[in-house]
């Protein structure tokens, strides 16, 4: 199960297994993850989310954009992040997230509405996985005051997305190798300003 080298406790591993079982049960009724990725759930989804722990303090307030099946937000909360806000406009997925949030002993707030640049909230870190392009994420989160950084789990098109975003935004960024994808990166974005 590849969680040993991430210093995840037995209790957390047990909660993640319960989360996996709940997700697979719900996935029969609503599309939380691709049916093809069910067999690779730990590697493709849970471990992919767990790798963000390296860049997060448990005391950070996290906003997870487009939480869907709970990646990475639910996983981070189960692992110890004290305050997590999950943003998911799909009502069925929000109901699933409410059920999954019971597996965490930490505070989770679910916002089940579509957000735009007028949405007003504060956080330390904004996370996103498979939600949208870097440009779109920067646009819809314009009203969110991010104290530290964004952590975006991106696939092979990350360079193209960053280049496109730089046409509209000025920001600093770091690229971190993904432990689950040779082509993907964790894109860390900070000091964000919109070009006039």
Residue ranges and their predicted role:
Residues 23, 76, 154:
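Residue-level signal for inorganic ion chemistry
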Residues 126-128:
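Hydrophobic beta-strand segment of the Class I
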Residues 112-113, 135-137, 141, 156:
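Non-DNA-binding regulatory cores of transcription-related proteins
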Residues 138-150:
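A short glycine-rich, Lys/Arg-flanked "PGG" loop and its adjoining helix->strand segment in the class I
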Residues 147-159:
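Conserved beta-strand signature within the Rossmann-like core of class I S-adenosyl-L-methionine
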Residues 82-85, 157-196:
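Active-site capping/gating segments
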Residues 1-59, 63, 92-106:
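Class I SAM-dependent transferase core
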Residues 50-122:
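Conserved SAM/SAH cofactor-binding pocket of Class I
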